[in-house]
Design a protein with these regions (language model features):
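Phosphate-handling catalytic cores of nucleic-acid transaction enzymes
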Residues: 2-4, 10, 20-605
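Intrinsically disordered, low-complexity terminal segments enriched in Ser/Thr
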Residues: 13-15
Length: 605
């Protein structure tokens, strides 16, 4: 028996029909990542499994305090994520974004997803990680885009050859046109001369000359037709890194219209000129044509049947400024609801190096081979791209699960619902689930080149387990959206961040963990820090701005976590004042330990 969500059509079991020992053995500590999320199973015939290559053993992975549901990812994708995390000590959401962006890029031009509501959707993903520059996203990206870069290099070499061949063909055609026009003029002169001299005697010659002229003119018409139909060969480039949105659109129009934008510096994209660029990105996410009419012919272009995957990273301070300037615009026109956003913490202090431990590459190589195979399967003729696409659909139980989840989310957006502030994301929630489910299914089970039939339900029908997995993943991205756009959740997160910084400063001032208030009466100087020093320590969420910082500490004061002490004259007549400060509140436990009374400081919400 094999889990629908964790198997692939291109080799996922051992030669004897069983799953890899490390992944499906009775040892629960190793099997958890593969088995505990299994919702349904299918029989895999022993004959079929004998034809499949042996799969690598599955890596053991036990991340600390990880909220992302990485166990829900299908086998090959999950294993690639784990290898990246173990090799380079990156946060799970960073590895997931790198891997899923490569999956989206590889599959987006090959499939549709039919959600059962009368329309098909493209399957491209937009993903954005808000994290520090030390998050190693570029390293994670490079691990899984090596196959894409190799594909681009191959296509660039082919393009150079095609350009040279096209130049030769154009020159040859133009040379033929010149020669034929010269011949046509000569025949016309001869016909005219013969007609003037003695048309009756030269009748047969004139007829032959006219026939020859007609033949030449037909050749010229055909060459002119070929000239009018000639198009410069398109470069099948699929990977971009640093390019403005308008130039990206133009490149999609002039080169290949299915591509990916992978950038570690997304500030230029987020700070685009405004609603126009964001609206274009919205259309590209939906696979809609874009018609741009510029001031000149060079500035005018048309993108037909586009596909775009985006994997972006931006620093927290840049993202916070973007939210302040354009957050409501991006949310209102739907850009942010189309993005799968994550704000992972960089695991500082845990990214140690141990060269005695070999790097894990088996699953990553398997993943990259699959990406390369999918990219190579795309049609090289732009006019025939859409003909080879397969439409995936939900099984009956999967359709019911998707609809049930969709309706529950929709009801939660009512005025009294729990997702009022997340309405924009919920508007796209069902489509996010469908896209991820389709990518999970096709990447693991999709067949290439003559290996599938029109009625092959195993390939086209997405099982319930895969939809349930996609729901778990999208639920996590919904929680990340809440962290940014739900005022209560955002305030709570900012408050926890301020409390964390306050605790760090107090521990520094007390040469270790703050254990008890010191001082007489209510004056406990070891429990407070200067207001503006704490504000200067808070670099995230735009909290260095006094107005925003004050809003958060006032919220904490109202909850009883801190007290705000205004400037206070400490020495009468000396004119020396203690600056405005923030003091942590505390509660006595009412008992003693080791000759010291115990206290609980209110660093938690």
């Amino acid at each position: 028996m094999t889990d629908d969500n964790n198997t692939s059509a291109y080799g996922d079991t051992d030669a004897d029909g069983s799953a890899p020992a490390d992944s499906l053995a009775s040892n629960e500590s190793t099997a958890t990542s593969l088995v505990e999320f299994s919702h349904s199973t299918i029989d895999v015939s022993r004959d079929e499994s004998r034809e499949r290559p042996r799969r690598p053993s599955f890596p053991t992975f036990e991340p600390e305090n990880e909220s992302f549901p990485w166990q829900a990812l299908p086998e090959t994708i999950r294993a690639a994520v784990i290898e990246i995390c173990l090799n380079d000590k990156v946060a799970v959401p960073i590895a997931v974004q790198a891997v899923m962006s490569a999956v989206s890029l590889a599959c987006q031009d090959l499939i549709w997803i039919d959600r059962g509501i009368g329309e098909k959707s493209v399957c491209s993903l937009y993903m954005l990680a808000v994290t520090d520059t030390g998050a190693r996203k570029s390293r994670a990206d490079s691990t899984v885009t090596s196959a894409v870069e190799a594909y681009d290099r191959e296509k660039r070499a082919e393009h150079l050859g095609a350009l040279e061949e096209a130049r030769y063909s154009v020159k040859e055609r133009q040379r033929n046109i010149v020669e034929l026009e010269k011949d046509a003029r000569a025949w016309r002169r001869q016909i005219r001369t013969l007609t003037i001299r003695d048309p009756e005697s030269n009748e047969n010659v004139i007829i032959l000359a006219k026939a020859k002229l007609d033949e030449i003119e037909q050749e010229l018409i055909e060459l002119a037709r070929q000239e009018s139909l000639h198009r410069k060969p398109r470069l099948q480039r699929v990977l971009y890194s640093k390019i403005p949105i308008r130039q990206l659109e133009q490149s999609l129009a002039e080169n290949w219209p299915s591509a990916g934008l992978f950038s570690d510096e997304a500030a230029g994209i987020l700070n685009a000129r405004g609603e126009s660029d964001m609206s274009s990105l919205d259309k590209l996410w939906e696979g809609k044509a874009i018609d741009v009419v510029g001031r000149t012919a060079r500035e005018s272009f048309f993108i037909e049947d586009p596909r775009l995957t985006m994997s972006l990273m931006v620093q927290p301070i840049v993202f916070d400024r973007f939210l302040e300037r354009k957050g409501e615009l991006a949310k209102g026109i739907g850009f942010m609801s189309r993005v799968l956003l994550s704000r992972p913490d960089t695991p500082y202090g845990k990214r140690t190096v141990d060269t005695s431990v070999p790097r894990l590459t088996e699953w990553t190589e398997l993943f990259n081979n699959r990406v390369r195979a999918l990219l190579s399967h795309g049609h090289s003729d732009i006019a025939l791209r859409s003909q080879g696409r397969k439409t995936l659909y939900f099984s009956q139980s999967a359709q019911q699960a998707w609809e049930k989840n969709f309706n529950e989310m929709e009801r939660a957006t009512a005025d009294d619902g729990k997702l009022v502030y997340e309405r924009e994301f919920v508007n796209r929630y069902g489509e996010h689930v469908a896209r991820l489910a389709a990518l999970f299914h096709f990447f693991e089970r999709g067949k290439l080149d003559g290996a599938s039939r029109a009625d092959d339900a195993t390939e086209r029908e997405i099982p319930e387990a895969t939809v349930t997995s996609a729901i778990r993943v999208v639920d996590w991205y919904l929680s990340e959206f809440k962290r940014v756009f739900n005022p209560e959740v955002a305030m709570r997160e900012m408050a926890l961040y301020v409390l964390k910084r306050l605790k760090q400063m107090l521990d520094e001032r007390n040469n270790g963990q703050l254990l008890e208030p010191l001082g007489m009466g209510q004056d406990h100087s070891n429990c407070r820090v200067p207001y503006h020093e704490l504000r200067a320590r808070c670099s995230r969420y735009d909290l260095k701005k006094t107005a925003k910082f004050d809003q958060v500490v006032r919220w904490l004061e109202g909850r009883g976590n801190v007290a705000i002490r205004e400037k206070d004259a400490r020495h009468a007549g000396a004119g020396k004042q203690e600056p405005k400060s923030i003091e942590i509140k505390y509660t006595s436990k009412g008992h003693w330990r080791g000759g010291r009374q115990e206290y609980v400081f209110h660093f938690d919400l």
